[in-house]
Amino acid sequence: MERRITTIILLVLLGITTVCAQQPKQVSGTVYSAAGHVLVGASVTGGGHTVVTNGDGYFVLKTDAELTSITVSHVGYRAQRVKLSPAQNEPLRVYLKTATIQLQEVLVMSANARELVAAAISKIPKNYSQQPELFHCFYRETAQKRNHYIMVAEGVVDMYKTAYDYQRNDDRVAIRKGRRLLSPRKGDTLSVKVTGGPVLPIQLDMVKQRDWLLNEEELGYYHLEMEMPTTIGDRQQYVVSMRPRRKMPHPLYFGRLYIDQETLAFTRAELSLDMSDRLKATQMMLVKKPLGVRFRPKELSLQIDYRLEDGVTRISYIRTLFRFNCDWRRRLFATAFTACCEMVVTGQDATTERPIRGRESFDQRDAFFDKVDYFLDPVFWQEYNIIEPTESLNRAIARLMKRR
C-alpha cells in the first residue's frame, strides 16, 4: 500500500462495463436472501460477462451472446443457476439459500492458519493466470458530504495484467469512456485527495503485489486464526482472521482472508485499516489537502474478490471505502465525508501483445475526475455492463444535473 493513486475526494460515481454488441440482450433483477433481505455485492454471471448487485441488490446484465441462464452467488450462500425463457422481459427475483456447514468442515478449525496461508502463497503461480490478459472493467467513484452525494465519476476501463509469475510489474489501466458530475455549490467541494483511483486493481491486487501483505515478513506482524468455514458460490472456503500483533511504523489491518479449500487459491479479502494511531492512518490515506484544513481519518476498508473460471482464478472486484472528517481551524464543527471507489471486471481476453501503451495508460498520480467529461448523454452506458446506480444515487445525479 506504499504506492499511491490519487483520486479527488469530491468525485463520486464510476461504473465498470464491458463492450457488447450494438443491440445487447439484457436481463435484470434483484437478489435476496431466503429471508427476504437484499444481497449487496452478489455476483451475477452469464453470456461470458459478470456484474455485481448494487446497494439495493439490483443488477442489469447485458450480452450479445445467447443468454439461456445466469449464475448468482454471494459469500455464505449457495450459488443458484437461474434458467431464462426466450421472452424474459420482467425483472427477476432471485432468492439464495444460506450454505450449510457440514460436520467435517468444522474440523478445519484445528488447522494451522499460518501454515495454510503460506501454502496458499506457494500455489499462487499455479492458481492464477500464467499468460497476459486484458480485462474489461467498470469503475465508479462517489463522494458524499454527510449524507448527500457531491461527486460522481464513472467509466469503462481496460486493464492489462501480465502473468502472475512474471517478475516485472507492467500492469496498466486505460480509460475508454467516462463521465463526471460535481456539485456546483461552493460549500460542497473540498480539494482533498486520498489514495484510490482506477489503478486500484493493480495496486491492491494482493496476490500479485505481495509486498504490502502476502509475504512472510509482513504476515509476521499479524495474529492469524482459523474461523468457521463458509462458501463462495458452491465452493468451500477456509476463513482466516487477522489482527495486528505489534506496533509498526506503518498501520496494519484487521480482516479476513478466504482460501478455496480445494485449490488453496485466495478468493477474497476483507480488510480494515487500524485506526488506533490517527497519524499513521492519515499518512496512509491522505495524499493532499489545502493548508489550514484538518484531516481526521475514521475508516479505510477494502474488499478484494477473485473468481475461479475455466480452472484459473482471476481478480473480479475491488471496493474501497474512506470515511473522514475535515474542518478548518478555528471552526467549531467538523464535516463528515465518505468516498467510495469500486471496480468490477465484466470480461477478459487473453493477449500476446501489450494493448495499453504510453499516453493511454492512467498514471497513479492522475485524478480520474480530470480525465472524463460531464454527464450529458442519458443513454451513455447503453451497450455496456455497469454496476447499476442505487435509487438514492440516481436521485442525487438528477438533483446535481438540475443545479448545473
What is each model feature region?
Residues R210-Q261, A265-L273, R307, T313:
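Extended beta-strand-rich segments in extracellular/periplasmic secretory proteins, especially
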Residues G46, V72-V82:
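A short, solvent-exposed loop/turn motif at the edges and junctions
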Residues Y95-Y222, G233-Q236, M285-L286, P290-R404:
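Surface-exposed, low-complexity/disordered segments
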Residues F59, E90-L92:
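Short strand-edge motifs at loop-to-beta-strand transitions and within beta-strands
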Residues A42-G46, I70, V108:
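Hydrophobic beta-strand segments
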Residues H37-L39, V60-L67:
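Short Pro-Gly-centered beta-turn/loop motif in secreted/extracellular proteins
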Residues H49-Y58:
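Short, acidic Ser/Thr/Gly-rich low-complexity loop/linker segments typical of extracellular
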Residues P24-V40:
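Structural motif
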